[in-house]
Structures are given as structure tokens and as C-alpha cells.
Amino acid sequence: MNFRLNKFALIASLILGFSAKAIPTPEAVEPAFDEDDNPTYIIKYGKGDRLKEDGTPLNLIQIRCQDKAVDMVSDEELEKCREDESLVEMQYGWMDFATYKGWRAYHAECHVCHGPDAMGSTYAPSLMVSLQEGLSYDDFFNVIMNGRGENEGAQKGNVMPAFGANTNVAPHVEDMYRYVKARAEGKIRRGVRLPKLPKFKEVD
């Protein structure tokens, strides 16, 4: 009897182990560009083609309120969603590695002044709002690389230093733009904390 139980347990563990390994391992995604050759992102919610080996969602949870990203709703809409759970939807998804690197680089260097999640602070503007108001990639790049003084439109008394020689910033400007753009368009909600993704690598 014990032999049969042990055998059954062994077979079950092998089946479960095989099932987990049978799920396709995520493959790298080339950094994305839009029709104007500006950096953009790849983010999918719902049923995607990327799962971790245990079958759980990869790294994003989006909360929708009345079919809008929760960051993009008014206070009145948000209050309705608090009162009626049927108006709330949770979506699970993933992002491309370049955008993930942008999130990581932004929170390593930029959030000290521009606030967590690109929301801004008392002494530096919200980059999310800047993109919503039309900040182009070229301007984004130039300000980061060369800085901005009061004569160039910086807030009084708060100049933007140049990061062109900063090796923690300069190589990642495209990726940071991808992340901030995704935030500005409501694809990544506020407060998301992403895990490390060691299996993702850039395509050569």
C-alpha cells in the first residue's frame, strides 16, 4: 500500500513538474518604435503569450474603473467604483524588456526630483503630464542630455542638470521615454513594483 502511494506521489510530482516546464519561456522583444521612429512600448493585458513557468501573470496588474485605467479617471468616477465593485476590473499582463529597463532606470535616478511613477514633485514637473501635453522624444532627450536652466523654461530656482555624462542615465534615455510614455497613456498604473526578469535579454 505504501509503495503504491509513494509511486502515485512520484508520478503526480513528475506530471506537475512537466506541466510547469511545458509553458513557453518568454522570449526577448526588440525595442519598439512608432511610425515616426520614436521609442514606444509593448504592453499587453488579458490573455497574452507570456507567462512565468508557474503559469502566473508576468509582472503587471492594471486596475480599470468604468473601463478606464484607474490613473485616468476623475474623482467622481473613482468614488463610484469604490461603491460598486462591478465597475472594477483587474487585468494581468506583461511589458517588453526595454520598457521594464526604463522603469528601473527612472526609479534609480529620476524619481528623486520628478517623483515616483513620473508624477512630479514640488521642485520638478511631472514627466507624465509633460508627455500628455506634447513633449516630444527629441526634446525629452535634449533636456536630459544637456540640462535646462531658467532661460530654457525650468522652474524658477530649480534647474535641470545635464546627464549626458552620467552612465546610469545616458544609455537608457530611450527606455525611460518608453516607461514615461506608457505611464502617460495609462498603460502602467501608479505604484507598480516590477520584479527582476533575469530571463529577458535584448535582441542583438
What residues fall within each predicted segment?
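Bacterial N-terminal signal peptides that target proteins for export
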Residues: 2-9
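Bacterial N-terminal signal peptides
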Residues: 9-17
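Sec/Tat signal peptide C-region and signal peptidase I cleavage site
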Residues: 18-22
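Flexible coil segments in periplasmic/lumen-exposed cytochrome c-class electron-transfer proteins
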Residues: 26-48, 55, 64-65, 74-92, ...
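Sequence/structural segment immediately N-terminal to covalent heme-attachment motifs in c-type
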Residues: 94-116, 141-146
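Gly/Gly-Pro-rich "capping" loops immediately C-terminal to redox-active cysteine motifs
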Residues: 99, 118-146, 162-166
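Short Fe-S-cluster ligation motifs
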Residues: 141-157
